[in-house]
Amino acid sequence: MSLLHIAVILPLIFVLIIPILYRFFKRIHLGWFVLPVPIVIFIYMLTLIKTTMSGNTVMKTLNWMPHFGMNFDLYLDGLGLLFSLLISGIGSLVVLYSIGYLNKSEQLGNFYCYLLLFMGAMLGVVLSDNVIILYLFWELTSFSSFLLISFWRERQASIYGAQKSLIITVFGGLSLLGGIILLAIPTQSFSIQYMIQHASEIQNSPFFIFAMILIMIGAFTKSAQFPFYIWLPDAMEAPTPVSAYLHSATMVKAGLYLIARMTPIFAASQGWIWTVTLVGLITLFWASLNATKQQDLKGILAFSTVSQLGMIMAMLGIGAISYHYQGDDSKIYAAAFTAAIFHLINHATFKGALFMITGAVDHSTGTRDVKKLGGLLTIMPISFTITVITALSMAGVPPFNGFLSKESFLETTFTASQANLFSVDTLGYLFPIIGIVGSVFTFVYSIKFIMHIFFGQYKPEQLPKKAHEVSILMLLSPAILATLVIVFGLFPGILTNSIIEPATSSINHTVIDDVEFHMFHGLTPAFLSTLVIYILGILLIVTFSYWVKLLQRQPGKLTFNYWYNRSANVIPNYSEKMTNSYVTDYSRNNLVIIFGALILLTFVTVFSVPFNINFKDVSPIRIFEVCIVILLLSAAFLILFAKSRLFNIIMLSAVGYAVSVLFIFFKAPDLALTQFVVESISTALFLLCFYHLPNLNRYNEKRSFQLTNALIAGGVGLSVIIIGLIAYGNRHFESISKFYQEHVYDLAHGKNMVNVILVDFRGMDTLFESSVLGIAGLAVYTMIKLRKKRQTQGNEVKNHE
C-alpha cells in the first residue's frame, strides 16, 4: 500500500479509533486528537508539489477486483493535488476552530467520526482514477454530509435540511453512475485517464450525449447549481464548522472538480460549453440577487456560496472553448481555467473565514438575525478586522485576492463573447452582461454583511446573550485565512507556478506556463466594468431599504423551494393511497396480486417472444422417479383436505423427504443429506411447538373463493414449468457449470463442487444468509425474553397488591 493510499484511508481508519479515545479521554477535547490527521495529510501533500510542478503525476494501484476492472487506483496530478490541499488544509483549520466552537458536552465522538468520514470520502473523490471507486466515495460524501447536517437532530430544521440535501445529491449521484457506465461502454475501461486518452471513441459513441447530460446533472446537484441550489441554504442548519468545511471549500467543490476532470472528454461538444457556462452564469445572477434579501447571516453566506460556485462553473465552461482552437488562441481561452482555479482557492479562503466569523457572532450574541445585530464594532474588534478583509475580498475590492480572480472572471466573459464558436454570435454578449450584474449584487451583499454585524445601533435588549469577543481558538483559524487573503492578493506568484499552472495543465490539453496576475492591467474592459460595478453597487447600498422590499415580496409559488416542498408532501401521500388500494392486512389477497402478476408476465412473454423448447438432451424418466413424484404430489394434495395440524406436519415432512430421495436419484448426495437434515429439524421444531399452537379452525369458504385459489395455484405451477422449459431450451450463454468444473480445485482447492460453491464462490451469499438467520433468532429470543420479563413484573405487581 502506497503513502497516497494511506493518505486517503487515514481519516477512515481514525474513525474506528475515535470511539475509544472518546471513551477514555473525556477530560480532553476530542478535537485535539483529531487535529493531527488533516495536518499530516496536508504536510504530505505539500511534499508532492515539486512532482506536479515538473509536469509529473503519481499513479498508485491497489488490486481490489481486477477481474471486473475495479481497483483502488489513485491518480494525483496538479488538479488532484490542489483539491487535496484544500481538503486537508481547510480541514485542519476547521478542526482547530471546532475545538473552541463545540462544548465538550456535545456528542463530539459522533461529530468527529462524521467529519473524518467526510474528509476521507472527499480525498477519495479527487484522487480516484477508477470511476466506480470515485462514485462510491461520491455517495459517501452525501451520506456523511447528511450525518453532519443533522448533527443537532433535536432540531426539526436540521432534519429537514439533511433530508433535502441527501435527496438532491443522491439523485445527482445516481445520474453520475449512469453517466460513468455509459462512458465505460465504448472504452471498456473504468479508468478516467484511459477515457481521456480515448476521448474520440467516447465522442463517436451513440451514448455520448446521454453520458454528458447525466454527468452534468451529477455535478450541478453537488455544486448547488441552478435549479438544484435549494438544498444548500437549508444545509446551513449544520454546526458552523460543518458549514465552513463542507459548504465553502470541499463538498460543494466536488461538482466543480467533476466538471474540470471531465472537460477533456466533453469539451468537443458545444452543448457542454453552452450548458456549463450558462448554468454557471444564471446561478451567479440568481443566487447573488437572493443573497441580498436574506435575514440570516448564514443565509447570506449560503446564497453567496451558490453565487461564487456559479462564477467558477461559468469559467470552466468558457475555458472549454480552448479545445476548439490551437496555439495562442487556445491559451487565450484556457486562461479561463486559470481564473477558475485561482478563484476556487480564493473562495475557500475568504468564505471559510466568513463562515467562522458568523459562528463566532452567533456564539457571542446567540443570534444570526440581521435585524437584531449591529453595533458590534467596538465589542468584537478582531472579528471586525477579519470580516472586513474577507468580505471585501468577496466583493472584489483590491488589494485582496478576490479582486484578482474577479478581474480574471470579467476578462474571460469578454473573451468568450468574441469567440466565433457559436452559431448565434449575439448570445455571446450575454456572458459579460450577466457577469457584471451578478458582480454588482455580490458587491452589495458583501458590504451589507459587514454593516449588518458591526455598524448601526447596538441592541443588547434583543440579543439572547451579552455580546463579547470570542476566544482565541475561534479566532485563530479565520485569522490565518484572512492573512492568506492578503498574501495571495499581494503576492499571487506564490500560487501560480506551484499550484495554479499544474492544475490548469491537468484540465487543458495545452501546457500553461506563463500565468500572471496583476492589480492593474490598464484601462481594459474588465477594469472599466469593475468601476461600473462599484458605482452601481454603492447606489444599490444607499437605496437598499427601498428596493430590497420588492425582492422580499416574491410570491412563494415562484420559488423552487415551494415546488420541492409540495412534491415532498404530495408524492408520499399519493404513494400511500396507491399502496393502500391494493395492499391489505389479509396476506392471501397480497399473494393473489403477486402471483397474478407473475402468471400474467409469464403468459404475455410466452405469446409475444419467440422461443424453442428442446427435449433432445432431456434425460430419460425412470419408473422409481415417477413413483417418488407421485408420492410427493399425493402428500401435497392431501394437505388441502387435512383436518388436523399434526397430519399437515406429517404430509409436509413427506414432501421434503421425497425431494431428498429425488436428489439422491439425480446424483446430488450432499443436497439430499442437507434436505434430510433440514426436514428433520423443522419437523422436530413443529412438533415441539405443536402443544402451544391453537386449534386448527376450518372455515366455510365460498366456491368462487376456492376456485380462485385453485386457478392461482395452478397458474403458478404452470408458469414455473414453462419458465424452466424455456430456460432449458434457449441457452444464449455457455453454462456457468463448466467454469466451476474447471476451477473448483485450481482456485478454491476443493473437490466437492457444491460445498465449494456455497462456501467459496458464493461465500458472501452464504455468510449473509447465515447472518439473517442469526439476526432472526436473536429477535425471537429477545421477544420471548421480554415477554417473560413482563409476565414476571405483572406477577410481582399482583403479589404486592
From Swiss-Prot:
Gene Ontology terms: cellular component: plasma membrane
GO terms, biological process: proton transmembrane transport; sodium ion transport
Subcellular location as annotated: Cell membrane
Transmembrane feature ranges: 1-21, 28-48, 79-99, 117-137, 166-186, 206-226, 265-285, 300-320, 337-357, 373-393, 427-447, 472-492, 522-542, 591-611, 623-643, 646-666, 671-691, 707-727, 764-784
Molecular function GO labels: antiporter activity
Alphabetical keyword list: Antiport, Cell membrane, Hydrogen ion transport, Ion transport, Membrane, Sodium, Sodium transport, Transmembrane, Transmembrane helix, Transport
Pfam families linked to this entry: MbhD (PF13244), MbhE (PF20501), Proton_antipo_M (PF00361), Proton_antipo_N (PF00662)
Membrane topology: Multi-pass membrane protein
Main location group: membrane
Subunit architecture: May form a heterooligomeric complex that consists of seven subunits: mnhA1, mnhB1, mnhC1, mnhD1, mnhE1, mnhF1 and mnhG1.
PANTHER family per record: NA(+)/H(+) ANTIPORTER SUBUNIT (PTHR43373), NA(+)_H(+) ANTIPORTER SUBUNIT A (PTHR43373:SF1)
Role according to the record: Mnh complex is a Na(+)/H(+) antiporter involved in Na(+) excretion.
Entries under NCBIfam families matching the protein: 2a6301s01, PRK12645.1
Membership in a protein family: Belongs to the CPA3 antiporters (TC 2.A.63) subunit A family.
UniProt protein name: Na(+)/H(+) antiporter subunit A1
Species: Staphylococcus aureus (strain bovine RF122 / ET3-1)
Taxon lineage: Bacteria, Bacillati, Bacillota, Bacilli, Bacillales
Gene assigned in the entry: mnhA1
